[in-house]
Amino acid sequence: MKPTFNPNNRKRKKVHGFRARMATKNGRNILAARRRKGRKALTV
């Protein structure tokens, strides 16, 4: 079996980065929830 986690910083940013979150309504909801919770880091 191939490993399921293949680290790739570009893919990581594209999928989970701040601008990726801001691009959609649901992504903005995620950021708002993390701000509400008081997370130190909002995104990767």
From Swiss-Prot:
GO molecular function, one term: structural constituent of ribosome
Gene3D superfamilies linked: 1.10.287.3980
Family annotation (Pfam families): Ribosomal_L34
Signal peptide start-end: none
Record has Ribosomal protein as a keyword: yes
Keywords: Ribonucleoprotein, Ribosomal protein
InterPro entries: Ribosomal_bL34
Keyword hit for Ribonucleoprotein: yes
One GO CC term on file: ribonucleoprotein complex
Disulphide bond pairs: none
Gene Ontology biological process: translation
UniProt similarity note: Belongs to the bacterial ribosomal protein bL34 family.
HAMAP family listed in its UniProt record: Ribosomal_bL34
NCBIfam families hit by this protein: rpmH_bact (TIGR01030)
Protein name according to UniProt: Large ribosomal subunit protein bL34
Protein species of origin: Exiguobacterium sp. (strain ATCC BAA-1283 / AT1b)
Top-level taxonomy: Bacteria, Bacillati, Bacillota, Bacilli, Bacillales
Gene this protein is translated from: rpmH
